[in-house]
Amino acid sequence: MLVAAAFGLVACGYGEEKLSVSKDDPDYNGAVLFSTHCSGCHTLSAAGTQGSGNRGERTQGPNLNQREETYEDALFAIQNGGFSGAIMPQNIVVGKEAEEIARFVAKYAGEDAETSPRPGETSSSP
């Protein structure tokens, strides 16, 4: 029972007040669900989450501000507990909720990611 309570605390979100996604955004519900179910481990500014990296816990998930994700990869991670060697709980959300979170992550993840220039573009880095 203590383990379940501890997991519940880790999985608790920070609340809607920290979301930077407006209520009229089609991905708003995904942001709320991410904040509720994923904030204990993952950092993503659009959801107002800081993950566990700043607490030094083993449950630190990827900082999604610095990592781009596709819808397919995000949904796979939700359904399968992350990728090889991950400690993410499998199916923490399922069905429509998993799809809404995956859409939200695909849209907002990677806002701080360094990206390589595409062919024909030049890098803005010095």
Regions found by a protein language model. Name each.
Residues M1-A4:
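Sec-dependent N-terminal signal peptides
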Residues E111-P126:
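Short, low-complexity, Pro/Ser/Thr/Gly-rich segments in the mature regions of secreted, periplasmic
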Residues G8-A11:
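C-terminal motif of bacterial Sec signal peptides marking the signal peptidase cleavage site
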Residues G56-G110:
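Extracytoplasmic electron-transfer domains, predominantly the class I c-type cytochrome c fold
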Residues G15-L19, K23-P26, A31-Q60, N80-I87, ...:
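Periplasmic/extracellular electron-transfer cofactor-ligation site
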